[in-house]
Design a protein with these regions (language model features):
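Accessory, non-ATPase domains that flank or precede helicase/AAA+ motor cores in DNA-metabolism machines
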Residues: 1-228
Length: 230
């Protein structure tokens, strides 16, 4: 206890209280309320242990932690048009706040209920926390991250979760397009026009274009969202 100080002490004690309620707790559920750093600190002290217990069945009866929003006519038209079976490219043209995210969420729900995974790509690392929160607030599933801000260990964990099917959702920036997934069901690229999806140094590529190729190879749909489509 002497090793803990200030705000860290309060956060770590609160996390320990939460962990003590169950013998096993999903890492994804912990990260809804606590940072990876807080979890890592108590793990380093030997107070808690992070273990991999292999892919888990998604509890479809309790998949949703919050109910979907009602769709407006334009959103409903888009949902009715999007076929979550087989390859096709869908463009959702809408300004910020027009409801693209709710369409993404409801499409993701569909593929998870089919027993498949979703790859969601965003242009900037800074958008990760708010996007991750939206997914964790809606779904009772594992969400893996893939971006350059992760440590090697975190990147390995996310890679494993996606490749084994433990993570139902993989959220990441352009490099996420290369991450293997056990049973991919849909790819979603938000702000597809953003130049951040293009790697300009070293091995040059367009993550958006590669995602379309991957979707075609996997025979799954891909949704491109943008306020200013390229």
């Amino acid at each position: 206890q002497e090793m803990l100080r200030g705000g860290r002490l309060h956060k770590q004690r609160a996390l320990l209280d939460e962990l003590s309620k169950k013998s096993l707790t999903r890492q994804g559920n912990i990260l809804k309320f606590y940072t990876r750093a807080t979890l890592q600190r108590i793990e380093e002290k030997g107070i808690a242990e992070l273990v991999c217990i292999g892919p888990q069945e998604v509890d479809l009866d309790n998949l949703l932690l919050e109910q979907p929003l009602s769709l407006n006519p334009s959103q409903q038209e888009a949902m009715d048009a999007i076929d979550c079976h087989g390859f096709n490219t869908w463009l959702i043209d809408g300004v910020t706040g027009s409801g693209k995210t709710e369409i993404y969420l409801q499409c993701i729900e569909k593929v998870i209920r089919y027993g498949r995974q979703a790859l969601v790509m965003i242009p900037e690392i800074s958008l990760t926390p708010q996007t991750e929160k939206r997914f964790r607030d809606r779904f009772n599933v594992e969400v893996a991250m893939m971006h350059s801000g992760l440590t090697d260990q975190e990147r390995l964990e996310s890679w494993t979760e996606a490749a084994t099917g433990q993570a139902a959702i993989l959220l990441g920036t352009r490099s996420a397009v290369f991450t293997p997934m056990k049973n991919p069901g849909i790819i979603i690229i938000d702000e597809e026009h953003d130049q951040s999806y293009k790697q300009q140094d070293g091995f040059r590529y367009s993550a958006r274009d590669l995602a379309v190729i991957r979707a075609k190879q996997e025979k799954i749909p891909i949704i491109l969202g943008s306020a200013t489509p390229s």
